[in-house]
């Protein structure tokens, strides 16, 4: 788990080399570093192992945490509780302990989650894995093949039960209101992580509503295409547990239901659990096209809706799956091979669409290699597509693709693209000179263990103001000379800027960022400050607006001995505000006016600006009309400026015209902030109409 808190003041990460704070001294362990006035203070998560034969296999994998970083969820084979006794003696003198799920709050000992309701030690052997939680972690879900409650009937090998652990004990989730277990082949929270889909809001914020799939997918994976155990061959269905009530949300609501053949795949739910999105190859509503597609079930009204409308071909929508959705369910990005927005898109291609209430909008067509089938169903496989990001309101999408989504010829290399609801698509990682690509883009190469990746929080590569953080091996600026991975940032209307030094032999990678972009965490082997004297070990730096700490007194250490003192590792002062600052900003890092972009259309230009609070937004430029707007709250706003008569004459005479636009924001309190951008107008051969673009 690699993650920064929303305010950038806390960072959690893992290290296979033990720090002095480590209580085990062996195996990978998570650490929590908190920023103080004097530096970073670090604690190790996970108490001293009680195993009689501790080893490097006793790794502690932190997969999740509450938003305030007060509680962590971990899987480990290390023995962190006296109740953890699911062991097996392999040979005399060596006892193997199996993986269990733990919950640990800062300052408290770890609590064994994967156990029965009583406090009798589990003697196993059995393996458990973390599945999900409520926002406050008062309810934690885990999966295991071990029957821990009376309702847990026998299931086939590799199948797993789904349990929820809370203060009053452990409960089987996949059980109906009469107390009978649902299905004969276990259950999965949300959907299988091998399919490349995480359990997006499969547990509501309060933990009251839990979405799960029956049967469990593990027996199918283990069978490898061979015959399935009894009870595992049935089409999967999506269920919801709401307190003691359980319902099949993917059940057909057709007046005369068709036979269920394909089954359903959970895609996402809203944060409060009021709506769930799933895909199915079956027609489940009377208005659904052949082959089914994307559906939404409203919990309160108990109404099932077909969302992937508009297909006219015989194959219907042919939905592959959901890429991203907002927490409130107002925006859902999904892939479909059908043409759902008139003639837009490519029939049979990997078309990306945006669903909003009442409409399906075509975004772009991705490369076939961007969408890959693994395990036989749904949007699966490739990490590039799963790494997509959206803003909290869903208006902006950041995606990786091998396709040429702009005029730039990427020659099949993976590049990062930014799309917004105005229809503008920008390649943020492409070579600004237009030369052929010399490298590929990634969003976060350091993801930690592949196991449990579905639980890992998305890194903040896309901020709500449109700023982007990405990695690339290409040199997008002259001072990037190492020929390997470096971290860049992109501000809408501007150009990519290098955040790391561009000189580190083994490159640098993006770790995470704070929600406001003030702190950008990067990992590098380069020594960016004098205090980093560990001879090239991988370190985490905070590239921070306002800089870091004053250098402490020199300590005498070398090599790995210095690795154990992260509390003295400062933020990267020399790479701080000078690199991250928005070009043209004079707000001292407050980011009152965080981004400016626009579009030329004929003889006018529409400027978009994002502001942080209430105030007056204005724009002007020589030869342009002035525009002014009072705004009552922070957000994105548009101002339209038109060419004056004299400027039109110059454009018609010369064929092109460049005007620098000054955008000014005056907050209700405090000093005004200004940004500039350049609008380039051009006209055709006859100069009877004009077109152009805006460049920051």
Name each model feature, range by range.
Residues 438, 550, 617-619, 649-651, ...:
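Short acidic, gly/pro-rich beta-turn/loop elements at beta-sheet edges
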Residues 452, 521-523, 546-547, 652-655, ...:
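Glycine-rich loops and low-complexity Gly/Arg-rich segments
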Residues 588-629, 656-696:
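Extracellular glycosylation-rich, acidic/polar low-complexity regions of adhesion-
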Residues 640-645:
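Short edge beta-strand/strand-turn motifs with a hydrophobic/aromatic core
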């Amino acid at each position: 788990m690699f993650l920064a808190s929303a305010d950038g003041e806390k960072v959690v990460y893992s290290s296979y080399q033990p720090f002095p704070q480590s209580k085990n001294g062996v195996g990978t362990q998570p650490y929590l570093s908190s920023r103080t006035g004097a530096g970073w203070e670090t604690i190790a998560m996970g108490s001293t192992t009680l195993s009689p034969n501790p080893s490097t296999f006793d790794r502690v994998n932190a997969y999740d945490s509450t938003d305030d970083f007060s509680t962590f969820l971990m899987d480990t084979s290390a023995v962190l509780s006296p109740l953890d006794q699911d062991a097996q003696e392999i040979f005399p003198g060596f006892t193997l302990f199996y993986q269990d799920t733990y919950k640990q709050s800062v300052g408290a000992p770890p609590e064994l989650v994967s156990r029965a309701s009583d406090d009798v030690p589990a003697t196993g052997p059995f393996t458990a894995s973390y599945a999900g939680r409520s926002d406050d972690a008062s309810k934690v879900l885990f999966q295991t093949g071990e029957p821990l409650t009376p309702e847990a009937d026998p299931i086939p090998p590799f199948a797993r039960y789904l349990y929820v652990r809370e203060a009053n004990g452990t409960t089987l989730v996949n059980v109906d209101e009469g107390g009978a277990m649902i299905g004969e082949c276990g259950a999965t929270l949300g959907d299988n992580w091998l399919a490349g889909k995480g359990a997006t809001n499969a547990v509501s914020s309060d933990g009251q509503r839990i979405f799960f799939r029956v049967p469990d997918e593990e027996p199918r994976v283990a069978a490898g295409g061979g015959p399935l155990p009894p009870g595992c061959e049935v089409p999967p269905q999506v269920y919801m547990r709401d307190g003691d009530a359980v319902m099949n949300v993917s059940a057909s609501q057709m007046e005369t239901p068709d036979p269920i053949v394909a089954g359903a795949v959970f895609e996402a739910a809203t944060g409060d659990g009021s709506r769930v999105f799933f895909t199915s190859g079956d027609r489940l509503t009377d208005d659904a096209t052949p082959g089914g597609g994307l559906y939404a079930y409203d919990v309160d009204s108990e109404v099932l809706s077909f969302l992937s409308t508009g297909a006219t071909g015989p194959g219907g929508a042919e939905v592959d799956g959901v890429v991203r959705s907002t927490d409130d369910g107002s925006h859902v990005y999904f892939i479909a091979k059908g043409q759902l927005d008139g003639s837009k898109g490519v029939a049979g291609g990997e078309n990306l669409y945006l669903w909003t209430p009442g409409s399906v909008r075509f975004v772009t067509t991705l490369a076939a290699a961007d969408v890959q089938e693994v395990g036989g169903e749904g949007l699966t496989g490739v990490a590039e597509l799963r790494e997509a990001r959206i803003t909290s309101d869903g208006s902006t999408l950041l995606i990786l693709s091998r396709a040429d989504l702009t005029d730039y010829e990427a020659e099949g290399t993976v590049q990062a693209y930014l799309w917004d609801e105005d229809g503008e698509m920008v390649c943020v990682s492409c070579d600004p000179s237009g030369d052929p690509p010399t490298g590929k883009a990634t969003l976060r190469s350091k993801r930690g263990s592949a196991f449990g990746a579905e639980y890992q929080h998305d890194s903040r590569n896309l901020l709500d103001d449109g700023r982007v953080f990405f990695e690339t091996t290409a040199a997008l600026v002259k001072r990037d000379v190492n020929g390997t991975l470096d971290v860049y940032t992109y501000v809408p209307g501007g150009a990519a800027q290098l955040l790391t030094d561009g000189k580190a032999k083994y490159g640098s990678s993006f770790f995470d960022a704070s929600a406001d972009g003030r702190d950008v965490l990067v990992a590098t082997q380069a020594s960016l400050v004098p205090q980093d004297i560990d001879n090239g070990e991988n370190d985490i730096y905070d590239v921070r607006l306002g800089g870091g700490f004053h250098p402490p007194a020199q300590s005498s250490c070398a090599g790995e001995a210095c690795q154990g003192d992260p509390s003295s590792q400062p933020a990267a002062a020399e790479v701080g505000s000078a690199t991250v600052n928005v070009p043209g900003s004079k707000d001292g890092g407050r980011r009152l006016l965080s981004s400016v972009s626009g579009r030329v259309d004929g003889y006018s230009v529409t400027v978009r600006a994002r502001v942080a609070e209430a105030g007056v937004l204005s724009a002007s430029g020589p030869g342009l009309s002035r525009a002014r707007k009072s705004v009552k709250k922070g957000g994105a706003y548009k101002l339209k400026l038109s060419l004056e008569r004299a400027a039109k004459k110059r454009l018609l005479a010369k064929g092109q015209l460049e005007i620098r636009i000054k955008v000014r924001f005056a907050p209700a309190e405090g000093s005004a902030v200004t940004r500039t951008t350049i609008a380039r107008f051009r006209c055709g051969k006859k100069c009877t109409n004009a077109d152009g673009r805006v460049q920051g």
